Regions:
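Class I S-adenosyl-L-methionine-dependent methyltransferase catalytic core
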Residues: 1-281
Length: 281
């Protein structure tokens, strides 16, 4: 089923947690002169028009990126993140997907491997990534991202940051995420794997972090950002999470310095809060 379109949700609270984490991870990777690969299993369109019909229909960005842009004082890393977004977006009414953020952060020597199965989003992704220079840096494939990831491991430079963020419209996505991580770690155990997931009332969502901890019990970071109390009918996403296997050593401290303020800014009611836990060797 390919019904999910991120254009309806671009720039929302979940994007803030996901993209801020991705920003911190890639900035860390850039500290070393050695090249790396960025692999995105569910890339989406790359860029989104916040003035378009999809974004305006739901207006989720108004409780996400719009609130961060309006904030007076932000912690250092969060302020740098928001400033970087303003620099890399071609127009004021646009918001980036993970691939566009990554192309701005990766260097000429790094490689990007992007997967998107949805035919319409794939065309948009292709067109948007044509703007990237040098062109040889980016490869876009209309293919299953789970299979595509495994086919690329281990990457030639033996350094990689991987983002896995399926829509989780179907229960099988939860199982596939767990399985692809098991397979990926067998082929490339030192990669940095970032998994985004929605915080929902459904059992699969609530159990996913514990399932991921079983895969990497000694080297992970787990962060959640809840923006409101779960609805009594159990409907809808009240937050989202990032689970990072082999996280940069600085990431826990950076998130600890920024998540309290991010949670405060994006709070929709008194039930807003964040979760942060990590375990490293």
């Amino acid at each position: 089923m390919l019904s999910y379109r991120h254009a309806f949700h671009a720039g929302n609270h979940a994007d803030m947690l996901k993209h801020f984490t991705l920003f911190l991870v890639l900035e860390y990777f850039n500290r070393k002169d050695k090249p790396y690969w960025y692999i995105d299993t569910h890339s989406g369109a790359g860029l989104y028009d916040l003035s378009g019909d999809e974004a305006q229909k739901v207006g989720e960005y108004k409780q996400g990126i719009a609130l961060l842009e309006q904030a007076d004082k932000l912690p250092a890393e969060l302020a740098e993140f928001v400033g970087r977004l303003k620099q890399i977006l071609p127009r004021d009414n646009l918001y980036c997907g993970s691939p566009w953020l990554a192309q701005a952060l990766t260097r000429d020597s790094d490689k990007m491997r992007l997967f998107e199965l949805h035919p319409a989003d794939f065309v948009h992704l292709q067109n948007n990534m044509r703007e990237v220079r040098p062109a040889r840096k980016v490869q876009v494939s209309q293919a299953d991202g789970y299979q595509g990831l495994i086919s690329l491991l281990p990457p030639p430079p033996r350094r990689a940051a991987v983002l896995i963020d399926p829509p989780y419209e179907e229960k099988q996505d939860y199982r596939r995420v767990v399985q692809v991580l098991k397979d990926a770690l067998k082929r490339f155990e030192t990669g940095c794997y970032m998994v985004w997931y929605p915080c929902l009332s459904r059992e699969e969502s609530r159990k996913l972090p514990d399932e991921l901890k079983k895969i990497a019990p000694d080297n992970y970071l787990h962060a959640e950002l809840h923006v409101h109390t779960p609805h009594s009918d159990g409907f809808g996403m009240h937050g989202s999470g990032m689970f990072v296997i082999n996280p940069p050593y600085m990431l826990a401290e950076q998130l600890q310095n920024n998540l309290p303020e991010l949670s405060k800014i994006l709070a929709q009611d008194a039930g807003a809060h964040y979760v942060l836990e990590s375990k490293t060797k």
